[in-house]
Every structure is written in structure tokens, then in C-alpha cells.
Amino acid sequence: MGEKVVVLIGPTAVGKTKMSIQLAKRLNGEIINGDSMQVYKGLDIGTAKIRQEETEGIPHHLLDIKEPHESFSVAEFQTLARSLIKDITKRGKLPIIVGGTGLYIQSVIYDYQFSDAPSNDLYRQSLERCSPDELYEQLKQIDPLSAERIHPNNVRRVIRALEIYHCTGKTMTEWLKEQKRQLVYNVALIGLTMEREKLYARINQRVDQMIDQGLIEEVKRLYEQGLRDCQAIQAIGYKELYAYFDGMLTLKEAIEQLKQNSRRYAKRQFTWFRNQMPVQWFDMTDDTIFERRVNEILHYIEGKFHFQSNM
């Protein structure tokens, strides 16, 4: 088994950032971002990216490494995160991956080989003659989950997903799910959960806070730069307000849609994590026992790795 790695997962707004700082302080850890949208510069408020003053001196990696117009793939994330795990471990620190993008996190800790996906040159050439819109429409029909992750203009990735379906009869989502997977690290997989009613209330409250903190102005800056056909703008919080700036929605409708999409995303995250990985769950519904939960998680990690934290 490889290096020791803590993975902290959970749906949006469950409290991962606050918990990750406490764990990193007591475990001599460094944090690796595991959210596919926090890699983008300028997408700060809408992605709930940690602010410098909130880090409490804990090093954070894989934040702000891409311009909004650039694409970012799960294979690229895998390479960068694994390199960081090696580097952080070599310096005597503990890598802690924190985030909500399930496939990205899975790709790092399991032995995913993206190059093993089947291919068909003739079929690919026939797809390359189609327009991006035609390709994306095909993908939406056969694999809506992949269509949510892949921007319509990321033609290479859309074609890859269609190619896998053509060769195997399985969607890329199903194909990845069925790969025989082995953990490549000694992993402590921690999940934070919360009663749905409270989580949804927190999500709604967080959206209101984002608006107060300047989300509309943040999205307007991107909109005015002409950034439109790029992966970053598909993020929840950005696509809804783009519809407002395009005159398709009123501001009230855009904000309501943002809340609804965030709640749906949280539900999908829960489903993914519960079905895909052997997670040790900790319920964060009761705010008054936060410190007790920190200690319970530390105790679990100590048992898993056989070492003592700075509790």
C-alpha cells in the first residue's frame, strides 16, 4: 500500500472547509483541493473557495491553477494530485484531499487507467465530421451524467465518451464504475453528512450569503470578458446568472434556480459517495458537537494509520 492519504468528502455546504482546517492543524497536514471548479482563477465566491484569511496558515494546493477559458480533465487532475501526494509525504506532512467532485477524487486514490478505455479510429473519424452541438446532443441522450461534467465545446472529451459507448455499449459513467479498482494509497475516507432538511436550509442560506458577498459582480466580470463557451462557466452559480445577464431569467428566478440546482447537486453527491466508495460517515447536523466530531474523526484516522495526532 502506498502513501497515507486522508480524503474528506461530502456534499456542498456540509462544512468540509471548517473541518479540513481543524484536521490539517492537528495532523500536520496540507490540503489538496478536490473540487473541479475551484481550480479556476476568478471563480471564487460561486465555488465557495477558501479565502486566504481562512486557511490559518495551512498550505492549500490545486486552487487557482487554470484560467477560466481553459479546460481541465479528470486525467489531468489525477496526475497533478498524485504528484502532490508524493511531494507532501516526502516533506513529512500528511496529504488531505478535500472536495465534492467524486470522480476526480476516485481517479486519484484508485488505480484508474484512462488510457485503457477502448477506442475505434473509424468511428472517431465519423464523429469528427459532426458539429459540436450535434455531438453534445448525442451525449446528452446516452449519458446525461457525463454531459453534465463535460462542456459542449470540449469536443475531444465528448467524442471520447461517445467512443466508449460505441465500443462497449456502456456509458463512460458505467464503464468507469465497472472497472476493477484497487486503492493505490493507504486511505482514510471520511464523509460528512447532515439531515437533508438542515443541509438544504444551509445551501439556501449560503446562496444568499454569496449574493451579499458579490457573486453577481463576480459573474458579471466573467460575462463582460466574453467568457461563454468554456468549462468553467458551466459551474453552478455561473450558468444561472449568465441566463440572467442574457435576459432569459429575472434575477429572482436566477437565484431561485441557483438554490434549486445546488440542492440537486448535493443530492447527487450523496448518492455518488454512498454507492462508490467505502466511506466512514460522520453526522454534522448538530452544530454544538463540532469539536466532539473533530476528535472522533481524529480517533478514526489514528486507528487507521496507527499514529498519534496533536489533539
Curated annotation (Swiss-Prot):
Superkingdom, natural source: Bacteria
Protein name: tRNA dimethylallyltransferase
Signal peptide per UniProt: none
Molecular function in Gene Ontology: ATP binding; tRNA dimethylallyltransferase activity
Binding site for substrate: 12-17
Region (Interaction with substrate tRNA): 35-38
Reactions catalysed: adenosine(37) in tRNA + dimethylallyl diphosphate = N(6)-dimethylallyladenosine(37) in tRNA + diphosphate
Binding residues annotated for ATP, in chain numbering: 10-17
UniProt xrefs under SUPFAM superfamilies: P-loop containing nucleoside triphosphate hydrolases (SSF52540)
General function of this protein: Catalyzes the transfer of a dimethylallyl group onto the adenine at position 37 in tRNAs that read codons beginning with uridine, leading to the formation of N6-(dimethylallyl)adenosine (i(6)A).
Gene Ontology biological process terms, A to Z: tRNA modification
Alphabetized InterPro entries for the sequence: Dimethylallyltransferase, IPT, P-loop_NTPase
Quaternary structure note: Monomer.
Site (Interaction with substrate tRNA): 101
Cofactor(s) needed for function: Mg(2+)
Key words, A-Z: ATP-binding, Magnesium, Nucleotide-binding, Transferase, tRNA processing
Pfam families: IPPT
Enzyme nomenclature, EC number: 2.5.1.75
Annotated family: Belongs to the IPP transferase family.
